[in-house]
Structures are given as structure tokens and as C-alpha cells.
UniProtKB/Swiss-Prot annotation:
GO terms for cellular component: cytosol. It comes from Borrelia hermsii (strain HS1 / DAH). Pfam families: RimP_N. This is Ribosome maturation factor RimP. The keyword Cytoplasm applies. Keywords: Cytoplasm, Ribosome biogenesis. NCBIfam families: PRK14630.1. Required for maturation of 30S ribosomal subunits. Belongs to the RimP family.
Length: 143
């Protein structure tokens, strides 16, 4: 019987590798169709890391996953990208200090995430600083 792995299992398998290198796991997606699989992982480190680091991470993570996954799969590793949609409260903390586009009503406003807390974050624009509840955010993306 072929073991099907879920996102939390992949997270647990790679967490020690990413922790040692000071890298945050932003997102994991696993897909399985007709005996083939795909694992997509988005990683982030405050000071950007290059292609060489991504290649090394790919090798290390692939070895960890191959030990558990007993079916053919491809592994895709990437960084968040410059226009990444912020998908969780946790990501506001990860991206503290970064410039974002934020939609609370119907228009985007550009500013920075100054500080992220448990239920809100401080958003700074050119002329104001406001406390924003995560529940009030319609959309947010890196800018």
C-alpha cells in the first residue's frame, strides 16, 4: 500500500532542516493523481537567499521526503515572490518590515507592516500609522 502524505507530515519532515538555516516555511501543498505526486513548498528568509541555497535545500528536502514517500513525485521549492498574496495572520509576522498593498474597503493602500501581533498589526503609510485587525483585511499582498 502506498502512503499518502499530507501537508502537516511534510512540514514535520522538513522543519528541522529549515530551522537550522533560519528559514520560514510559508506554505506547503501536496497533490496526488494516478500514482504521481507533487509537493510544492514556499520558503522565506529575511535576508533573501539565492539560487544556490534553494538548490541545496531542494536536495536536503528531497532526501527527507524520498525516505517516506514511496511513489513518484516532483518537488517544487520557491520563495514568496514580490507580489505574493498574504494568506494567513502568521505571514504578517513573517513579513514584518516589508512593503505591502492592503485592501480594507475597496481600494488598495500601500504601506509597511511595522509590527504584527496575535490579532492585529500596525500598518504605516506615508502619513499615518493604524492598527489593523486581521479580520478587517479583505486582501493583502507584498509590494
Amino acid at each position: 500500500m502506498v502512503k499518502i502524505v499530507d501537508n502537516s507530515e511534510v512540514y514535520n519532515l522538513i522543519k528541522n532542516v529549515t530551522d537550522r538555516l533560519g528559514i520560514e516555511i510559508i506554505e506547503i501543498n501536496t497533490f496526488r493523481k494516478r500514482g504521481e505526486g507533487r509537493v510544492q513548498i514556499v520558503l522565506y528568509k529575511g535576508d533573501d537567499f539565492g539560487v544556490d541555497t534553494l538548490c541545496d535545500l531542494h536536495k536536503m528536502i528531497l532526501l527527507n521526503l524520498e525516505a517516506v514517500l514511496k511513489y513518484n513525485f516532483s518537488l517544487e521549492i520557491s520563495t514568496p515572490g514580490i507580489n505574493r498574496k498574504i494568506k494567513s495572520d502568521r505571514e504578517f509576522k513573517i513579513f514584518e518590515g516589508k512593503k505591502i498593498k492592503l485592501m480594507l474597503d475597496n481600494d488598495f493602500e500601500e504601506g509597511f507592516i511595522l509590527k504584527a501581533g496575535a490579532d492585529s498589526f500596525i500598518f504605516k503609510t506615508d502619513n499615518k500609522e493604524v492598527k489593523v485587525l486581521y479580520s478587517d483585511v479583505k486582501k493583502a499582498k507584498l509590494s
